Amino acid sequence: MDYSFDTTAEDPWVRISDCIKNLFSPIMTENHSHMPLQPNVSLSEGDGTQGHPDGTPPKLETANGTPKVYRPADSSTVKKGPPVAPKPAWFRQSLKGLRNRASDPRRLPDPALSVQPVPASREHPGPHTQASSIKQRISSFETFGSSQRLDKGAQRLSLQLSSGEAAKPVGKHEGGRLPGLLGRGAVPTLAPQETEQVLPSGSPAASEATDPGVSESPPPGRQPSEKTLPPSPDPLLRLLPTQTEESQGPVLKMPSQRARSFPLTRSQSCETKLLDEKTSKLYSISSQVSSAVMKSLLCLPSSISWGQAPCIPKEGASPTSLSNEDSAANGCAETSGSDTGFSLNLSELREYTEGLTEAKEADDGDHSSPQSGQSVISLLSSEELKQLIEEVKDLDEATLKQLDSIHVTILHKEEGAGLGFSLAGGADLENKVITVHRVFPNGLASQEGTIQKGNEVLSINGKSLKGTTHNDALAILRQAREPRQAVIVTRKLTPETVPDLNSSTDSAASASAASDVSVDSTAEATVCTVTLEKMSGGLGFSLEGGKGSLQGDKPLTINRIFKGAASEQSETVQPGDEILHLAGTAMQGLTRFEAWNIIKALPDGPVTIVIKRKSMQSKGTSAAGDS
């Protein structure tokens, strides 16, 4: 067509004001004046879509008359007015979209639209279009574009269902949801993550996918929103057993893993590195007995018989912390006269393997009942007992004789109470063997009677002390405060093998000995009590070491003595002395800053200090020695 008359819409010799030019632009003038020609042009150049006078709103994507409204804006040579206020971003994008879509007036329609049985009308209603504004055109364009997308989706779905391709997941991007089961075995098409959640659920719809009453098509009228699949028995039957097996696999393995969560031979890897093979076997057997007894006390169902157990725990605890154990200590029938605990000599295990019906009492355990050995053995499960019997049978006579000196002591106590003894030695000290440093007079160990000073401690609550450092051993001893039961395996050392108990530079006494201010004189170290005068300048000495120091966790020691101080004149303290207690406060585990805060908080006057000095004689206040 000829659009030459479009360029004469405005007289270039007549000046029009800016306001009028903005209100009545050439685009709008040409739009209103020549718009009645557009329906005729579209009808004459259409592709057989005439005969729709019902005024159906056109789809602007395939309309042929739309570009003719905006084309003169690009090709006209009229003078343009000054710039006006910028239009919003959405307005410019919408106009640009209209121009891009209208660049080719004779472009072919979409392939999806060409197969529609009833094509949509492309006729423009003349009067309505003339009266419409640009914003109305934009809103109608967005509305028609969205409705056309829905029609396209519906058409694709109908074509795929009619061609027999509905077995594949159709409309994956359309986000179909399942409003309800359409058939007894119908499986809806969902997103991949939703399909994985539906299949392993074991629902009757998934298990009966081969039922002949499956609905193969959704109800009419709801086709775009509901999509179902015909039954495909083979993939479902293949997926469902695999999902079921995967879900049931961990469940079946959990009991065995929980049953073995407390290893029987926990310290076996450590014992294999020992130089003496016989000693290694003794450590292994004692550690097995200790861990097996502690495990049985924590998890009673693993024992052989409920009725033979000496005490029934109410709560289980993890094998590492052992902090939540709660048992009926007063109900134990194995204690004789008191419920503090009992001990078992490992020689009774040997006699039990030989077929004796009654266990033999320990040589130094006259306080224990004759049934204590049988009671402890009854705590072990059949597998643990069988393994112990096999290991005992493999021992030679010399090693079997050493079993007489190994005792398993079970203490019943209150929660949070100490065991009544302290430890000495460690792998990081000269004395490599962990031994009992002291048994407190009124403690549980003293009341039970089996644990003596100088005995080697093999394990506490199933945790082997072989090869551990001194601090680690003290940590294991402190952890034993939490449970209401404690299983300690000790060995009575012969005089030839008794190590030097006080060769360590670290404190071996526990916090329960804080009130003890007596002098403990031994071969190399001396613990004594001194009294110093606290003045405004302090106690007259400086400290070094402490927890978290540059050299690591070290004991608090005296670094140097200040000149002119009372401590220098009296010579009661010397550099290198370790401070154990200060004014009744234990100094173990404190940093140097915390120790100085304690000293600053003391009032002026005499202060009692317990120190440990490496010397043969004590230079402090004399007191009775502790054997």
UniProtKB/Swiss-Prot annotation:
Pfam families reported in the protein's UniProt record: PDZ (PF00595)
Biased composition (Polar residues): 318-337
Molecular function, one GO term: cytokine activity
Region feature (Disordered): 34-136, 162-267, 316-337
Domain PDZ: 407-492, 529-614
Domain of life (superkingdom): Eukaryota
PROSITE patterns, alphabetized: PDZ
Keywords from the named record: Chemotaxis, Cytokine, Cytoplasm, Nucleus, Phosphoprotein, Repeat, Secreted, Transcription, Transcription regulation
A GO biological process held by the record: induction of positive chemotaxis
InterPro entries for this protein: IL-16 (IPR020450), IL-16-like (IPR055287), PDZ (IPR001478), PDZ_sf (IPR036034)
Interaction with PPP1R12A, PPP1R12B and PPP1R12C: annotated span: 401-497
Job of this protein: Interleukin-16 stimulates a migratory response in CD4+ lymphocytes, monocytes, and eosinophils. Primes CD4+ T-cells for IL-2 and IL-15 responsiveness. Also induces T-lymphocyte expression of interleukin 2 receptor. Ligand for CD4.
PANTHER family the UniProt entry points to: PRO-INTERLEUKIN-16 (PTHR48484:SF2)
Assembly notes: Homotetramer. Pro-interleukin-16 interacts (via PDZ 2 domain) with PPP1R12A, PPP1R12B and PPP1R12C. Pro-interleukin-16 interacts with GRIN2A. Pro-interleukin-16 interacts with GABPB1. Pro-interleukin-16 interacts (via PDZ 3 domain) with HDAC3.
Name of the molecule in the record: Pro-interleukin-16
Origin species: Saimiri sciureus
Gene name of this polypeptide: IL16
